[in-house]
């Protein structure tokens, strides 16, 4: 079976989360090397989760997930925010993308805490730092709680700054989850009614 034929359930799911216009879609495009997600200066361009399968070396087959902004507004916006949070249930590794020019906002901090509650391995990316001299802009409490193997990543989807560092970080975090993937993967959801059929024939194959 080729890499492109790997079932979704056997892939490490990497989700990109953050506020509108934090540059999630641009960063995802930079990581995948493709124009997968629509990019625009207009807030709320991503209205539904977008997925892309790829190979992330040395990890292997992964599924990248772009999500709607967690600060969307209005009745429809609230539904999009809820959908983004629901995607955490399918995420093995989370990427919290923060606008490096403004630093983390309350919505970022709320998402960060939810990611930690779910014990999802994560990386914090300060995006839009086009100048190599631009550094950590007030990530504060968020960066102080990051695992030592993944420090704050200063990045620019436009210039490519930090993209390789992010790939390496995701590969390390993904390795931690690789052996804990469930057999059923994304086939069932919480509260689903499941019937388990067990063969009682002694001649039935084991497994």
What residues fall within each predicted segment?
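Conserved beta-strand elements of the Class I
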Residues: 15, 193-195
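Solvent-exposed alpha-helical segments within well-ordered globular domains of core cellular machineries
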Residues: 29, 62, 82-89, 106-113, ...
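Canonical P-loop GTPase G-domain recognition
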Residues: 120-186, 192-193, 202
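Charge-patterned, long linear interaction tracts outside catalytic cores
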Residues: 199-207
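Helical mechanochemical/support elements of P-loop NTPase systems and associated helical scaffolds
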Residues: 42, 46, 50, 80-90, ...
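Conserved G1/Walker A P-loop phosphate-binding module
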Residues: 1-78, 82-90, 117
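Conserved Switch II/interswitch segment of TRAFAC-class P-loop GTPases
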Residues: 72-73, 88-110, 119-136, 160, ...
């Amino acid at each position: 079976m080729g890499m492109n034929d790997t079932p979704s359930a056997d892939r490490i799911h990497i989700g990109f989360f953050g506020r509108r216009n934090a540059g999630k879609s641009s960063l995802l495009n930079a990581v995948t090397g493709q124009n997968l997600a629509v990019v625009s200066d207009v807030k709320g361009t991503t209205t539904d989760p977008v997925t892309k399968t790829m190979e992330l070396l040395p990890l292997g087959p992964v599924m990248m997930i772009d999500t709607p902004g967690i600060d969307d507004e209005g009745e429809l916006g609230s539904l999009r925010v809820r959908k983004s949070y629901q995607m955490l249930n399918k995420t093995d590794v989370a990427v919290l993308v923060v606008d490096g020019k403004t630093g983390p906002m309350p919505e970022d901090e709320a998402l960060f805490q939810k990611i930690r509650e779910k014990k999802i391995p994560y990386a914090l990316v300060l995006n839009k730092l086009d100048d190599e001299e631009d550094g950590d802009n007030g990530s504060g409490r968020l960066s102080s709680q990051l695992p030592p193997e993944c420090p704050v990543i200063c990045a620019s989807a436009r210039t490519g700054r930090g993209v390789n560092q992010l790939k390496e970080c995701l590969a390390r975090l993904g390795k931690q989850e690789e052996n804990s993937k469930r057999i059923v993967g994304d086939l069932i959801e919480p509260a689903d009614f499941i019937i388990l059929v067990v063969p009682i024939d002694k001649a039935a194959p084991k497994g």
